[in-house]
């Protein structure tokens, strides 16, 4: 048993930056669509969560409801995962005093059309226990800020690792209060939101998110370190 334990320990290495590798979005479709094309008021603040519904837990949903209470012109755009989840989320919103028409459900569509609609989002809201992975990357590469809560286990730290990689630690919260405050600040301060979006549009900054050569080099170093031991 001690030999096996040592072997397992030898295979554990900290990956610098993030575990996730992406080849990036080459060309994000830009067709000048309006929010109203997707059932959203054109003058609204659009908050989105396109993560699968099983990632939404009671605590994070309550935070979303608190945010909607603080932002009267905000709407929550959620992936329409299945009918049961849709009904449950709608009922939960009502229990928190939020009108069901402020939850807009987005059907699954092909990737190009999804990236096209993603550009209409003001701020993306990450889930807590199980973060977005590709969902977070898609948002960031579409110049949409993602606010996350950094947890203590792997699946709850993915988005924070991606944000840290591109120098946006300011979007990482450590509890629900911070999470709500950061989202409300982004939505309330247009100059601040614009600054964050401009940073996400910076190719030099974003290149780190999909630098496959650098990722491969760092991964090879990890493997060499394992072999040495």
Show the residue positions of the predicted features.
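Single conserved hydrophobic/aromatic residue that forms the stacking wall/gate
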Residues: 1-8, 12
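Hydrophobic/aromatic beta-strand patches that form the interior of the parallel beta-sheet core
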Residues: 13-16, 106, 123-125, 147
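Conserved catalytic-core segment of nucleotide-activated headgroup transferases in glycan assembly
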Residues: 18-110, 117-119
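C-terminal amphipathic helix plus adjacent low-complexity
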Residues: 39-41, 51-53, 66, 79-81, ...
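Catalytic binding pocket for nucleotide-activated donors in carbohydrate/polymer assembly enzymes
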Residues: 118, 123, 127-209
